[in-house]
């Protein structure tokens, strides 16, 4: 299939070949018939992408601050590489389309193949032959509404939500500033709801179009508009003003204040500088509001991705119910869309269309609809011409990779591409855009959105999984079933029940494939050096580990029961494994305490202290906190043994104090990513034995769940048979 994407690095817009995205259990797969180009929004996105790095920094100073804080903590080089990786990732364009359902997931049973649907949402309702859309971002198209009309859904509900923010009543007088697509939809909805409407735009053609759509007074003159509003409201002013224009100045807001009555509402639906003269605002006690997207549920992962609806008794107009309402207005001919369509263009000419838009060749454009071919094959595997795949040599290992999130693309995939004897074969992600771009970037031979190719392809000798936590236990089972070596990003699993199932399965195996969990820290040169300093110790040691993890909101996916479960489960095995590597023994007893906060500004289980007793008599304490400053050191280790002390900080500087001081330093953080992947490949080749036994891997997860239990019961937990 083909899809329109933009490089945020260069601003270039291209029509590229992609594998068809996965439908997924909580999605529907839609064959697009039409999609709508949102000229204002998409032009702004492209213009930002075309700016230089300095221009982007000036446009988004908030992101610059975040990058600087990260650089102070993790080093300039690593932060720069991650930032460039984000800029390099292509952005799908488009957020409003219509088509026919071809597949529906088990959790999207409200839709069936053959349904005509309107789809909304950035990153979902894209300009592409096929789109994978969550149910709350789709709606069946009424019989009287054409597919072409339904493609206006997203713009329609942005307008509708902006109107709702004004909290209007029948007969209210509303002035609309800006008669682009958003404004022309707004004036029609307002009239359908019984409001008196006046409007203004600097383009006379759009003013004429508004008049054709029934607006009694529309003008290009701000003074004339002010006189008309004054006249029709008997000198009081408008009850509400909607700003649907796109402007960098404060003039639209200043004009809106002059047009408003006392205690009116100004709603910024488009873009404008919202720093008006305070005295003017104060004189009329006007409310200045901003309308966000398409209504409640917008940008909420639980609503958009998980399909959790908001109860109608509490939230009457979610974005999906807004979409239903907009389509009702269209079906009853209260909103006319055909007059708004100025261009109907074949999807195959999308690239040229964007070029013409940006070059100013389509000044008369209002509604630009892309039309798609009726038939496009569903192809989920895309092969590239042979390209270099990193260092080569004898006994190469064909590697298939599952998943390519931000962490994988920033750290693990670059390391894997440089790993000796690793031949990058196929990259699989659920998103075709991510799969195609990342596969080309790192030198894979092919990309796919179908996982089965990784297990069935004979040329793939090992699988690297960089997927969400809740998928990990299943992938271990797949690896065992196919006897295929697996490198699995931590954790091994997310529940004690999954761990028990894996233990039982492993015990039944006569031959177990290599399963290496991504506990990279034990492979760090700093840890290797600390192990050398510890190798001749005589007595049990005392180890203190501190992790300044950084705050993650309670609604983040890592806290979700269905995906991440908790940060303890998702991250703690890293530090348990590191303790096991440094001490050379397994934990046998656990005591743990957490803070007792409000579980919102402070997530209780993200702020814990765990005390571990090891089988060799050593003790280790782990302080894990999400309440610290991000600019402070993230990780520190102190070890006391045989009248010696080891201190290590952030995998950049390690020191041994023993009648003097020895120091081991590296230029940047060395957390062991390259080394762990090289070790995995060498194990698959039979050149090395696994550094971590399956017993140690399972035990680190047992310890994690033991910490959870100790926190819940506030009792000491004993682990048997260490």
Located regions from the model:
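C-terminal capping/lid region of NAD(P)-dependent oxidoreductase domains
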Residues: 4, 231, 235, 240-242, ...
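Glycine-rich beta-strand-centered segment in the early N-terminal region that forms part
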Residues: 21-37, 45-122, 685
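Mid-domain Rossmann-like dinucleotide-binding core that forms the NAD(H)/NADP(H) cofactor-binding site
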Residues: 123, 146-223, 227
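Beta-strand-loop-alpha-helix segment that lines the small-molecule cofactor/substrate pocket
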Residues: 261, 473-519
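Rossmann-fold NAD(P)-binding glycine/threonine-rich loop
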Residues: 269-286, 291, 297, 492-514
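Predominantly a Rossmann-like dinucleotide-binding segment in NAD(P)-dependent oxidoreductases
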Residues: 297-314, 512-513, 521-601, 714
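Contiguous beta-strand/loop segments that form the cofactor/metal-binding neighborhood of enzyme cores
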Residues: 355, 360-374, 378-381, 570, ...
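N-terminal Rossmann-like dinucleotide-binding module
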Residues: 379-442
């Amino acid at each position: 299939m083909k899809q329109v994407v933009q490089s945020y690095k260069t601003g270039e817009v291209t029509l590229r070949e992609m594998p068809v995205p996965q439908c997924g259990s909580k999605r529907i797969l839609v064959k697009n018939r039409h999609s709508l180009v949102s000229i204002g929004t998409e032009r702004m996105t492209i213009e930002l992408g075309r700016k230089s790095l300095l221009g982007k920094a000036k446009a988004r100073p908030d992101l610059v601050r975040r990058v600087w804080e990260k650089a102070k903590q993790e080093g300039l080089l690593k932060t720069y590489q991650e930032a460039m990786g984000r800029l390099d990732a292509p952005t799908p364009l488009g957020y409003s389309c219509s088509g026919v359902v071809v597949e529906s997931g088990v959790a999207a049973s409200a839709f069936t193949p053959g349904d005509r649907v309107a789809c909304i949402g950035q990153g979902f309702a894209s300009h592409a032959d096929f789109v994978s859309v969550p149910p709350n971002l789709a709606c069946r198209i009424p019989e009287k509404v054409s597919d072409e009309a339904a493609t206006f859904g997203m713009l329609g509900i942005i307008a509708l939500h902006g109107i709702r923010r004004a909290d209007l009543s029948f007969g209210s007088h509303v002035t609309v500033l800006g008669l682009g697509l958003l404004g022309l939809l707004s004036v029609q909805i307002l009239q359908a709801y019984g409001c008196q409407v006046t409007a203004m735009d600097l383009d006379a053609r759009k003013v004429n179009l508004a008049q054709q759509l029934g607006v009694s007074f529309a003008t290009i003159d701000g003074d004339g508009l002010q006189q008309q509003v004054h006249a029709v409201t008997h000198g009081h002013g408008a009850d509400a003003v909607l700003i649907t224009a796109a402007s960098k100045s404060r003039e639209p807001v200043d004009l809106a204040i002059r047009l408003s009555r006392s205690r009116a509402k100004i709603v910024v639906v488009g873009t404008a500088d919202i720093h008006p003269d305070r005295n003017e605002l104060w004189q009329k006690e006007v409310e200045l509001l901003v309308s966000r997207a398409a209504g409640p549920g917008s940008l909420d992962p639980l609503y958009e991705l998980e399909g959790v609806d908001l109860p109608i008794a509490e939230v009457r107009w979610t974005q999906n119910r807004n979409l239903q309402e907009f389509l009702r207005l269209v079906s009853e001919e209260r909103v006319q869309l055909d007059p708004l369509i100025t261009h109907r263009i074949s999807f195959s000419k999308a690239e040229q269309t964007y070029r013409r838009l940006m070059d100013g060749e389509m000044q008369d454009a209002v509604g630009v609809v892309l039309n798609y071919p009726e038939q496009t094959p569903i192809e989920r595997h895309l092969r590239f011409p042979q390209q270099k795949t990193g260092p080569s040599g004898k006994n190469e290992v064909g590697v298939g990779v599952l998943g390519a999130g931000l962490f994988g693309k920033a750290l693990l995939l670059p390391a894997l591409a440089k790993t000796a004897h690793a031949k990058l074969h196929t990259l699989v992600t659920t998103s075709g855009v991510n799969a195609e771009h990342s596969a080309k970037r790192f030198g894979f031979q092919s990309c796919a959105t179908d996982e089965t190719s990784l297990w069935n392809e004979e040329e793939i000798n090992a699988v690297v999984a960089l997927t969400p936590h809740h998928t990990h236990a299943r992938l271990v089972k797949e690896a065992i079933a196919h006897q295929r070596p697996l490198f699995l990003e931590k954790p091994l699993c997310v529940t004690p029940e999954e761990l028990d199932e894996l233990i039982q399965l492993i015990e039944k195996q006569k031959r177990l494939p290599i399963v290496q969990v991504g506990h990279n820290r034990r492979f760090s040169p700093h840890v290797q050096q600390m192990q050398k300093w510890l190798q001749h110790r005589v007595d049990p040691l005392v180890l203190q580990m501190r992790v300044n993890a950084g705050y993650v909101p309670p609604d983040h996916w890592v806290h979700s029961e269905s995906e991440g479960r908790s940060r303890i489960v998702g991250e703690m095995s890293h530090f348990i494994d590191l303790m096991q590597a440094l001490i050379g023994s397994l934990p046998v007893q656990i005591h743990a305490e957490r803070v007792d906060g409000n579980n919102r500004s402070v997530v209780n289980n993200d702020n814990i202290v765990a005390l571990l007793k090891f089988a060799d008599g050593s003790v280790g304490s782990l302080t894990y906190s999400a309440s610290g400053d991000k600019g402070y050191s993230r990780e520190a280790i102190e070890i006391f043994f045989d009248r010696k002390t080891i201190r290590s900080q952030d995998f950049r500087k390690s020191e041994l104090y023993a009648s003097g001081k020895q120091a081991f330093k590296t230029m940047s953080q060395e957390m062991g990513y390259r080394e762990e992947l090289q070790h995995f490949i060498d194990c698959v080749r039979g050149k090395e034995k696994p550094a971590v036994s399956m017993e140690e891997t399972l035990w680190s997860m047992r310890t994690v769940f033991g910490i959870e239990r100790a926190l819940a019961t506030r009792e000491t937990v004993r682990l048997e048979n260490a």
